[in-house]
Design a protein with these regions (language model features):
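N-terminal pre-Walker A segment at the start of P-loop NTPase domains
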Residues: 5-25
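Substrate-engagement module of ASCE P-loop NTPases
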Residues: 148, 181-204
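Structural recognition of the conserved hydrophobic beta-strand(s) that form the central parallel beta-sheet
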Residues: 160, 207-212
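Conserved lysine of the Walker
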Residues: 47
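Mid-core helix/loop region of P-loop NTP-binding domains shared across ATPases and GTPases
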Residues: 119-163, 186
Length: 219
C-alpha cells in the first residue's frame, strides 16, 4: 500500500491502492446540517482531498462507480439520499498571481472560464454553449458566470470552491488599496460571489462547499 503524500485526487487514491484514512462519515453530517458549508483549516490538512471526495460522491456521472469507490467506506455502508444526484461545478483559486490588479483579474477570470468550460464539456453541452461563455470573458468573471447560470437553467448544481480566499489574503498582505478594489463594492471578486448568491436564491445552486485557509504562524 502506497502513502499518498501530496496526492489530493480521491478517485486515484482509492483505485490505485493508496493508504486512505476514511473520513466519509462526515459527508452525512454535512448533508444533514446545512446546504452551504465552509471548511476552514490550515495548509496540508486534507481540504482538497475531502473536496475531491465530495465531488466523486455527489457527481451524477459517478453513480456507476459508487460501489467501487465507496462500497468499503463508512458512507458506502450508509449512503445518504443525495448521493450521485448533482452536476458539480468546481473552482480552484489557489496560486493566482497577485502582483497587480490586472494580474489578479486575469488569473481569476482564467480560472473561472476554465472551470465553466470543463463543466460544459463534462455534462455534454454543445460547442455553441461553450462559445457563449467565452464571449463573456472580456466582460469579466461575473459576466461569464451569469451567462453560465442562464445557460444551464434548472440543472441541479453542487458548487465547490477550493481556497476561495488564497489570493485575496495574499493581496491584503501586500496592498489594502488593491484588496479593496477587487473585493470591495464594485470589485470583480465581489461581483462574482454576488452572482453565486443570486443563483442560490433562485435554486440553481442547491448546495455549496468552500474551503479556505486557516493561517498559522508557519503558514
Amino acid at each position: 500500500m502506497k502513502i499518498p503524500y501530496g496526492e489530493s485526487n480521491f478517485k486515484k487514491i482509492i483505485t490505485q491502492d493508496f493508504f486512505y484514512i476514511d473520513k466519509t462519515e462526515y459527508i452525512s453530517l454535512l448533508e444533514q446540517h446545512g446546504s452551504y458549508n465552509i471548511l476552514l483549516r490550515p495548509r496540508r490538512f486534507g481540504k482538497t482531498l475531502f473536496l475531491s471526495t465530495l465531488r466523486s460522491y455527489y457527481d451524477i456521472l459517478c453513480r456507476n462507480e459508487f460501489e467501487a469507490l465507496f462500497g468499503h467506506l463508512a458512507i458506502g455502508h450508509n449512503p445518504t439520499p443525495l448521493k450521485n444526484s448533482y452536476q458539480i461545478i468546481a473552482f480552484d483559486f489557489s496560486g493566482i498571481e497577485t502582483g497587480s490588479h490586472e494580474n489578479v483579474r486575469q488569473g481569476f477570470s482564467g480560472r473561472t472560464g476554465d472551470s465553466l468550460r470543463k463543466f460544459l464539456v463534462r455534462y455534454g453541452y454543445s460547442q455553441g454553449d461553450i462559445l457563449r461563455i467565452e464571449e463573456e470573458e472580456r466582460n469579466g468573471p461575473a459576466a461569464m458566470l451569469s451567462r453560465f447560470f442562464a445557460l444551464i437553467g434548472e440543472a441541479h448544481i453542487y458548487l465547490v470552491i477550493d481556497e476561495y480566499d488564497n489570493f485575496a489574503n495574499a493581496v491584503l498582505g501586500d496592498s489594502l488599496e488593491l484588496f479593496t478594489e477587487i473585493v470591495g463594492k464594485g470589485g470583480f471578486v465581489r461581483a462574482f460571489y454576488e452572482v453565486i448568491k443570486t443563483a442560490t436564491m433562485e435554486g440553481i445552486v442547491d448546495r455549496r462547499f468552500i474551503t479556505c485557509l486557516l493561517y498559522t504562524s508557519d503558514a
